[in-house]
């Protein structure tokens, strides 16, 4: 668990930190050239149904993070940022550098989707 150096008063805050760490650990495992959905990450972290929480966790990462946040996408095989925005273009560029092929803004999850333990 992350040591914050402060007295934590609420159990829910500790649980929140633990959940974020689980999510970070799973995202760290996604290999180059593969992607995982928000819901998939939530399920692997023991948080089924909390895909939006995974999205929030990715959104609140520091800009200097080394975590491959861009490998987390929606379950339809596309980027969740609005098409054409700075964030969309950055994520698309990073995925393309790893060999993800976009066709009309999407990519086949059957080809590029990550299955934990299948590396």
Q: Which residues fall in each region the model found?
A:
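Nucleic acid-binding interface residues in structured DNA/RNA-binding domains
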Residues: 5, 13-119
């Amino acid at each position: 668990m992350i040591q914050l150096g402060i007295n934590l008063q609420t159990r829910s805050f500790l649980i929140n930190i633990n959940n974020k760490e689980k999510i970070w650990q799973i995202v760290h495992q996604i290999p180059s050239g593969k992607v995982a959905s928000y819901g998939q990450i939530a399920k692997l972290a023991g948080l089924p149904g909390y895909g939006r929480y995974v999205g929030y966790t990715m959104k609140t990462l520091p800009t200097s993070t080394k975590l491959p946040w861009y490998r987390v996408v929606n379950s339809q095989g596309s980027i969740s940022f609005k098409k054409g925005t700075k964030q969309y273009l950055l994520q698309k560029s990073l995925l393309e550098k790893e060999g993800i092929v976009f066709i009309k803004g999407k990519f086949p999850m059957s080809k590029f989707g990550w299955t934990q333990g299948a590396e």
